[in-house]
Design a protein with these regions (language model features):
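N-terminal Sec-pathway targeting helices
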Residues: 1-17
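N-terminal pre-catalytic segment of deacetylase/amide-hydrolase enzymes
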Residues: 14-99, 255, 265-272
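Extracellular/periplasmic catalytic domains that process cell-envelope and extracellular macromolecules
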Residues: 33-36, 92-95, 119-121, 160-163, ...
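Metal-dependent polysaccharide deacetylase catalytic core of the NodB/CE4 family, i.e.
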Residues: 42, 46-49, 54, 97-99, ...
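Aromatic- and glycine-enriched glycan-recognition loops and surfaces
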Residues: 58-72, 106-108, 147-155
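Solvent-exposed, polar/charged alpha-helical surfaces in well-ordered, non-transmembrane soluble domains
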Residues: 62-69, 73, 112, 116, ...
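Membrane-embedded segments
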Residues: 87, 96-98, 102, 106-114
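His/Asp/Glu-enriched short active-site or ligand-binding loop at hydrolase and phosphoryl-transfer sites
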Residues: 190, 197, 201, 213-220, ...
Length: 277
């Protein structure tokens, strides 16, 4: 298989990451969206009121509101991953101006800042959560948390899922780390095919099983941590019930009518509006 360059976003301290290009994937994985309806994917992370912290992966509620207002006023229709799957299964077509709005990592601000704005502007979004983060913050008393850094609890994820405006995506249970041994859910050096298949499948299935128990809905979407993956990753993740794959590559998307649905996403950093994207 031919190799292509893929976008990798490395996140430091949970919110700061650097987009880099890593040639580790076959052309087939990113060529799967070459025909059909076109759409745009937007990638957000944290939303904070403290303007001094705004940057590459943190925006303010005001910036998010400006984006949603622009999208709404200009006829964009937000579509969820499960809706993409349904449209494909039924042979339907996407709205002329389709956008998929995504939030990675599962910050608690998704409930308190993002959801109210989604409701106000009639938009929908997918929030991709990390299971181990949610476990940790579900054990902490409210007094021990602060909205500026806290992650969603399982109860809060249930509220978001029940809102009708948010779909919950899988961002791995415990592979959201970038260290010398493994970068996200990519294969470790000298890891056998069987070892890699087992560890990746069990991680993804663990979070999907938990989300199904909590929300009553099994996630169809998966976001690669840091955009990092290896040849064979998508097939393994797909065997855990995932059919929509989110990357960090900044390029338009097209609906794949036959294989996997891939959502390439433009990172929305502070100062770079949805209109500019």
């Amino acid at each position: 298989m031919k190799s292509v360059r893929i976008c990798v976003a490395a996140i430091t301290a949970g919110v700061v990451c650097i987009a880099v290009m890593l040639g580790i994937l076959s052309a087939a994985i990113y060529a799967e969206n070459e025909s059909g309806d076109s759409f745009i994917g937007l990638m957000y992370h944290q939303v904070l009121k403290d303007e001094s912290r705004a940057g590459k992966y943190i925006i303010t509620p005001g910036e998010l509101e400006s984006d949603l207002a622009y999208l709404s006023e200009n006829g964009y229709v937000s579509v969820l991953p499960s809706q993409l799957v349904k449209i494909r299964e039924q042979g339907g077509r996407l709205p002329e101006k389709t956008v998929v709005i995504t939030f990675d990592d599962g910050y608690e601000t998704g409930l308190y800042y993002v959801l109210p704005l989604l409701k106000e502007y009639g938009m929908k979004a997918v929030i991709n959560v990390v299971g181990s983060y949610t476990d940790e913050y579900s054990r902490i008393n409210e007094e021990g948390k602060h909205l500026s850094y806290a992650y969603l609890t399982w109860n809060e994820i249930k509220k978001l899922s029940d809102s009708g405006y948010v779909e919950i995506g899988n961002h791995t249970y415990n592979m959201h780390s970038n260290n010398v041994e493994r970068n996200g859910c990519a294969r470790k050096e000298n890891e056998s095919d069987e070892q890699y298949r087992t560890v990746l499948y069990e991680d993804v299935a663990r979070l999907s099983d938990k989300l199904q128990r909590v929300t009553g809905k099994r996630p169809v979407a998966f976001a690669y941590p840091f955009g990092s993956l290896s040849e064979g990753s998508a097939e393994i993740i797909g065997s855990a019930g995932i059919s929509v794959f989110m990357t960090c590559c900044e390029q338009p998307c097209s609906m794949n009518r036959n294989g996997r649905i891939v959502i390439n996403r433009y990172n929305r950093e502070s100062g770079r509006s949805a209109q500019q994207i």
